[in-house]
Every structure is written in structure tokens, then in C-alpha cells.
Design a protein with these regions (language model features):
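Core SAM-dependent methyltransferase catalytic element
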Residues: 182-184
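Chalcogenol-based redox active-site neighborhoods
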Residues: 1-163, 168-172, 179
């Protein structure tokens, strides 16, 4: 059953974290934040909603990098019950979709809880002060849409505005996805 994200809590301060990346290194938020803003997105490998946007996420991330915005992906699912989301499969998923951003493993699920993440994908767009300005979706595309010219680039446009003004758009469309798979 699909889950929607909650509305943006403008000004909420990003929580620090220290997580292992698929490159086997440990990173903190301070290591990875962007000069003009940061996107943190909770994703996984098995969810059809994530699979549908993975290539668009890779593209938008490359475009955001050009304007000083970094992207950080975090996988917080229970890998014991969802082995497709394992650390090794995270590496494979990243390669398959040509991710050029850090893909971090939240093994203890503390970061997902700290951020009140509810689904995959769940996007958090922060300004350069690491204050939340966007909690929306990647774009207006439907799950199987591949016609780029018909899609409104909501994440990109919001982060572009944030990079220029430190403020996110008032109107935001919630992301939809699979629920985070919590450990029991």
C-alpha cells in the first residue's frame, strides 16, 4: 500500500548523522552537504516507486550538482526481511542507475527516525543553512513515465529556488512510495 509524505516543516534543522556509504567509507552530513543546499532522499532497492524514478533521480542529482546542491541517498529498510535492500544490492542498484552521489546505509534506522522519513522515496530539501525548505516529490511524472518533456521537474525547480533565495516554494506535492520497512 502506497504511503504519502507529510507536509514540509519549513525551517526544521537537518539532523547530523554518521553512516557507511557503498564506497565503504563513513560520512557525516557535514562531509556531504552542498554549498547552496542539500537533498537527502530515503530510497531502497526493491520498491517499484524508487525503481520508477531511479534514473530520473540520477539525472536530477547531476543537474543539481551544477548549481551547488548535493544529493545524499539513504537506505534504512530492514534488510533481514527485505534482502533485495542489502548493502551489496545497494552497490548494484547504484551502479545500475549510475548514481554519482553517496548512497548510505542506515543499518540501525536511527536516521530515518530522526528525519521522520515514512516512505521510499522521501525527499528532504535543505537550504545552505541546513534548514528544511522542501518535502515534496521528484517530479510530476507517473511511475512508468519516460517522456521527459511532459514532466514538471519539481525537485529541481524547488532546489534551484532554494539555492537562489534560501526559501522553498509554498506549494509542494507530497511524495508517494513504499513504507519504510522497520525492524521488529
Amino acid at each position: 500500500m502506497p504511503v504519502n509524505t507529510s507536509n514540509c516543516s519549513f525551517g526544521w534543522k537537518a539532523r547530523e548523522f554518521k553512516l557507511k556509504s557503498i564506497d565503504e567509507k563513513i560520512y557525516t552530513l557535514q562531509d556531504l552537504k552542498g554549498l547552496k543546499g542539500t537533498v537527502i532522499v530515503f530510497i531502497c532497492n526493491h520498491c517499484p516507486y524508487v525503481k520508477a524514478i531511479a534514473d530520473r533521480l540520477a539525472f536530477e542529482s547531476r543537474e543539481l550538482t551544477k548549481i551547488g546542491i548535493s544529493t545524499i541517498a539513504i537506505m534504512s529498510n530492514d534488510v533481514e526481511n527485505y534482502p533485495e535492500d542489502s548493502f551489496e544490492n545497494m552497490k548494484n542498484f547504484s551502479r545500475l542507475h549510475n548514481f554519482q552521489f553517496p548512497y548510505l546505509y542506515d543499518e540501525l534506522q536511527t536516521v530515518a527516525k530522526d528525519y521522520d522519513a515514512v516512505c521510499t522515496p522521501d525527499f528532504f530539501g535543505f537550504n545552505k543553512l541546513l534548514k528544511l525548505q522542501y518535502r515534496g516529490r521528484i517530479d510530476s511524472g507517473v511511475m512508468n513515465s519516460h517522456e521527459e518533456n511532459e514532466i514538471k521537474r519539481e525537485l529541481y525547480e524547488a532546489m534551484k529556488l532554494i539555492s537562489e533565495t534560501n526559501q522553498g516554494p509554498i506549494k509542494q506535492n507530497n511524495s508517494i512510495g513504499c513504507s519504510i520497512k522497520w525492524k521488529k
